[in-house]
Amino acid sequence: MVYIVVLIVILLDQMVKLLVMEKMKVSESIPIIKDVFHLTYVQNRGAAFGILPGRRYLFIVITVVVISFLLIYYYKTRGSGMVTLSTGLIIGGALGNLIDRIRFGYVVDYLDFRIWPVFNLADSSVVIGAALLILYLWQQEKVGD
C-alpha cells in the first residue's frame, strides 16, 4: 500500500514539474491570485529555502539514507494506515525531488505564496507526511502512558 502512495506522489510531482519546465521560463512568475499566490519557476540548487547551494551529492546521499530509515520503520510498524500514509508521502516527496537532483542538478520549484520561499508538490508531501508521522508518534506515546 505504501508504494501506491509513493507512486501517486511521484507521478503528480513529476507531471507538474514537466509542465512548468515546458511552459515557463526560469524566474517567470504567473499571478494566480495577485500578491497572494503565483506560479514561479525556480531552479533550486540547494536544500529547503535554497540553503547550502551546490551540495547536490550530499543531498542525494542524505535522501537515500532517510528513505532507507523510513522503509525500515514502515516494515517494522506495518499495519497502521497513518504510518502507511505518512511514510508514503515523505518517501514519495523525497523521491520526487531526488529525481530532479539526479536528472538536472537542481529541484524544480513553482508554488509561490509571496511570503515564503518557492516550493513544490514534493516539498508539500514531505511536510504533510512528517506532520502526520509526528502526530501518529505523539498519539502512540499518549496511548502507552
Swiss-Prot record:
BP term (GO), one: proteolysis
EC class: hydrolase
Key word rRNA-binding present: no
Membrane disposition: Multi-pass membrane protein
A Pfam short name: Peptidase_A8
Stretches that traverse the bilayer: 1-21, 57-77, 79-99, 115-135
Catalytic activity, as annotated: Release of signal peptides from bacterial membrane prolipoproteins. Hydrolyzes -Xaa-Yaa-Zaa-|-(S,diacylglyceryl)Cys-, in which Xaa is hydrophobic (preferably Leu), and Yaa (Ala or Ser) and Zaa (Gly or Ala) have small, neutral side chains
GO cellular component terms given for this protein: plasma membrane
PROSITE patterns found in the cross-reference section: SPASE_II (PS00855)
Pathway recorded for this protein: Protein modification; lipoprotein biosynthesis (signal peptide cleavage)
Molecular function per GO: aspartic-type endopeptidase activity
Keywords on record: Aspartyl protease, Cell inner membrane, Cell membrane, Hydrolase, Membrane, Protease, Transmembrane, Transmembrane helix
Intracellular or extracellular location(s): Cell inner membrane
Enzyme Commission number(s): 3.4.23.36
Residues annotated as the enzyme's active site: 109, 123
Source superkingdom: Bacteria
Disulfide cysteine pairs (residue numbers): none
Family named by the database record: Belongs to the peptidase A8 family.
Database matches in PANTHER family: LIPOPROTEIN SIGNAL PEPTIDASE
Name of the featured protein: Lipoprotein signal peptidase
Organism the protein comes from: Halothermothrix orenii (strain H 168 / OCM 544 / DSM 9562)
